[in-house]
C-alpha cells in the first residue's frame, strides 16, 4: 500500500532519517505474533537510522505509572493506560489517548504513523493523526 508516497519496504531504505510513530497493543517481551513482528519492525527501523516513537499500553508486569519512558538510542517510548484484555488478562488493551497524542505529536511531529493494532488506542491515534494531517499506514 502506498500512503504518503512511501511503500512500507521503502521506509528502511529511505535516505533521510524518518521519525516513525508506531502504535501497538502488544510488544516484546510479550510473546505473540504481533508483538514479535512489531519488535522486529522497530529494531529494523532503529538499525537503519530512523527514530521510532513507540506508543503502547503499560503491561501488568511493568511497574509504575503510564507515561513517557527514558529514551534509548533511536527509540522514544510512551506507555498508555490500559485495561485487561478479556480472556487474555496478561495483556492490557490500550485506552484512548487522543489528547495526549495530539500534544505529543504537536511537539515532536512524526513523518508517518504506523497503526499496528486498531483497538481503542489505535483508533484514538488515527483520530489524532488525521487532526494533525499526518500520513497513516496500517
Where are each of the predicted segments found?
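Acceptor-binding helix/loop patch of EC 2.4 sugar-transfer enzymes
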Residues: 82, 137-138
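Proline-centered loop/turn at the N-terminus of a beta-strand
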Residues: 133-135
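A generic "cationic amphipathic patch" detector
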Residues: 33, 65, 90, 123-126, ...
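N-terminal subdomain of nucleotide-sugar transferases
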Residues: 1-82, 105
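An amphipathic, basic-hydrophobic alpha-helix
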Residues: 87-112, 117-127, 131
